[in-house]
Amino acid sequence: GYNGLPHLYVPVVTEPKQAASALQWAVSEMERRLKVFERLNVRKISTYNEKQAAGEFEHYDNPPQKMPYLVIIIDELSDLMMVAGKDVEASIVRIAQLGRAAGIHLIVATQRPSSNVVTGLIKANITNRIAFNVATGIDSRVIIDQMGAEKLTGLGDMLFSKVDWGKPRRIQGCFVSDDEINEIVEFVKSQSEPDYHEEILSAVAPASMSMAGGGGHCPHRSRRAARR
């Protein structure tokens, strides 16, 4: 499995409650970074890291550190939407709107492209989309706003829709075998040990879960995670 990869901030998350918490942590981290940028008069993470590396912030009492880029991969969105739909939707939308400047990016996937999973708000804010072969033209419309994906042949055949292209382009994904994936993962694992930040998984309890009796909101832990 992917656990043990040195670049992971947390172990692979399989519990929807923990995943929703991690998303809310990402929103807090994004907002923290943007406040730092505002205070230092920079607009985006690349400029910030260049200035930080050049020592331009050394005169501060507590000089800010280099910020890593973060990529959040959601392998199946429908599971999250069933558990904490409104909270997850709000987090995804917020990160999609402002995360790029802060170096926080989203890859969201689902095998159930229905309108209650890929909501209008999520679609409006995630404008670059890929559709593989789907069962119906309706499913295709949910993903790329037009029919066509139902006619794809499978095996990596896809339609890629980008906001500035006008219409989707048909492209072919490369096949990578399980053995090849495992070899690459094991090689990367051998290079270094991960430094997990597991408090992220319980830093914030989504509101809908708290009301249902799952975990409560812990302001101290939330602030501690947001400072990471």
Where are these regions (language model features)?
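P-loop NTPase motor-domain active sites and their immediate coupling elements
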Residues: S21-R228
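P-loop NTPase switch/communication element
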Residues: G1-E15, S21-Q24, L121
